[in-house]
């Protein structure tokens, strides 16, 4: 029974590995039109990578819940969870960012042969995520908030962009994803938030008045996310993610 939570954690890792397969195969499709302009497209399989990362996030939540329910928490499980999270929410989203940077540069007239150096910022995501997890494992645990952005939250944000790319009907959204500087900003923001010590809401319900306040926050964030998804499609996940940051910072500002 004590190994059941670890099986969930290993499923998280398996989904992260499968996401990497979907991201890397078959790679970008590049062709030219009659005017000699590059026509670049990301493979549709990258959307399945997003599904794997979303699935890993669900499993990551369940393994902790199952461990507490079975009273099977262990030091081994904590370390295994961190190692799995680095792959599923660090390396896999980092490779999504890497592929999008390749796509962004390849869409430019002289961008096919861009130096690899310009793609390396994508690796800040797994580096910052690994640092954040190592700090989490060695810091004194807190029950009321996260210290810095949790790596699954960063991974989910990055994983939403392939769905925006493939299922968005808005040209301006595609133009944003085709802009390498937009990607650099996203990568730097996520990496900074992960290594920061900003207190962000953990939504750990402990009873009393704090529960009622957390429920209100959850309702606000869900309403913003759902309404944004109805208006903007998958880009609504980004809006909901920003709403989570704003609510967290306002909570810290307003709470004595």
Q: At which residue positions do the language-model features occur?
A:
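C-terminal membrane-associated helical module and adjoining short loops/tails
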Residues: 143-256
């Amino acid at each position: 029974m004590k190994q059941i939570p670890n099986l969930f954690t290993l499923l998280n890792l398996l989904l992260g590995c499968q996401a990497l397969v979907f991201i890397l195969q078959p790679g970008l499709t590049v062709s030219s039109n009659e005017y000699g302009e590059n026509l670049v497209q990301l493979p549709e399989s990258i959307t399945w990578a997003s599904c794997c990362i979303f699935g890993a996030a669900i499993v990551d939540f369940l393994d902790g819940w199952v461990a507490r329910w079975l009273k099977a928490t262990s030091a081994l499980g904590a370390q295994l969870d961190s190692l799995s999270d680095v792959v599923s929410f660090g390396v896999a989203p980092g490779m999504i960012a890497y592929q999008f940077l390749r796509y962004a540069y390849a869409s430019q007239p002289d961008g096919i042969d861009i130096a690899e150096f310009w793609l390396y910022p994508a690796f800040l995501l797994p580096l910052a995520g690994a640092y954040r997890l190592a700090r989490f494992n060695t810091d004194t645990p807190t029950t009321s908030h996260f210290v810095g952005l949790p790596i699954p939250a960063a991974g989910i944000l990055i994983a939403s962009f392939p769905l925006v790319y493939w299922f968005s009907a808005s040209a301006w959204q595609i133009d944003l994803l085709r802009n390498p500087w937009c990607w650099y900003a996203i990568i730097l923001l996520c990496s900074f938030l992960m290594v920061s010590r900003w207190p962000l809401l953990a939504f750990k319900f402990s009873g009393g008045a704090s529960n009622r306040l957390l429920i209100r926050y959850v309702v606000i964030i869900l309403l913003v996310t759902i309404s944004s998804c109805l208006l903007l499609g998958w880009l609504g996940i980004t809006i909901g993610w920003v709403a989570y940051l704003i609510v967290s910072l306002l909570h810290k500002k307003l709470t004595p």
